[in-house]
């Protein structure tokens, strides 16, 4: 990571590292370590960051919502720290631009892959914790996860839009839901898919994504937005 990129990611995160090697490692995928044998990669930091994130979110929810049960708090926390939520945080911070990975991984779409970006968020959290301590990283997490926390509390995070759509439509009995691949474009390593969702022979949503599954989920998400007002 060159000096320009290092300064840029520090500015995006709002963290200025005493030990720059921590953030460099946090943004190094294991494929890069396989290609360059001396490179340290982020899997150990990811392991630590997962626990730090869980602790900070758990403590925040425990202190904030004294009237909620253990089950309710667990559900809210699971929405905040799930892969989908971490991916949204990664996109907001543009972490994908800074992750070091092998050329092979990048050519197969690794830079856009949800799991790689979500893992990088956890690794960055660990890097901040090791460099700045628990108080600082707690503030860091609450700052960058504030929107996700509010969405989880208000039950606005849906992990599986296709299932949510199915459940919503079951209220009206048997309804036929179909997903149709419209087209795909781009080179094989960066192919984007476009899909629509058809409900009782009517197109209700169109979605796109870097996999067929992601495109279908986004189509279902659009359909939900159009339909849910009718069920309020």
UniProtKB/Swiss-Prot annotation:
GO terms for molecular function: double-stranded RNA binding; metal ion binding; ribonuclease III activity; rRNA binding. The keyword Nuclease applies. Residues 160-229 form the DRBM domain. Its cofactor is Mg(2+). Its main location: cytoplasm. Mg(2+) binds at residues 46, 119, 122. Belongs to the ribonuclease III family. PANTHER family: RIBONUCLEASE 3, RIBONUCLEASE III. This is Ribonuclease 3. The gene is rnc.
């Amino acid at each position: 990571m060159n000096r320009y990129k290092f300064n840029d990611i520090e500015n995006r995160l709002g963290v200025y590292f005493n030990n720059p090697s921590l953030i460099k490692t946090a943004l190094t995928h294991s494929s890069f370590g396989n290609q360059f044998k001396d490179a340290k990669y982020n899997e150990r930091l990811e392991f630590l960051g997962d626990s730090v994130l869980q602790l900070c979110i758990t403590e925040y929810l425990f202190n904030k919502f004294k009237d909620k049960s253990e089950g309710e708090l667990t559900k809210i926390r699971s929405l905040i720290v799930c892969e989908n939520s971490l991916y949204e945080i990664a996109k907001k911070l543009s972490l994908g631009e800074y992750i070091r990975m092998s050329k092979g991984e990048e050519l197969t779409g690794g830079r856009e892959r949800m799991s790689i970006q979500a893992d990088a968020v956890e690794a960055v959290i660990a890097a901040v914790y090791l460099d700045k301590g628990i108080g600082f990283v707690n503030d860091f997490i609450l700052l960058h996860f504030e929107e996700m926390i509010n969405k989880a509390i208000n039950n606005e995070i849906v992990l599986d839009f296709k299932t949510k759509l199915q459940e919503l439509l079951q209220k009206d009995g048997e309804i036929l839901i179909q997903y149709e691949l419209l087209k795909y474009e781009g080179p094989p390593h960066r192919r984007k898919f476009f899909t629509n969702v058809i409900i009782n022979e009517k197109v209700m949503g169109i979605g796109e994504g870097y996999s067929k599954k992601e495109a279908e989920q986004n189509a279902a998400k659009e359909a939900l937005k159009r339909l849910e007002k009718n069920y309020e």
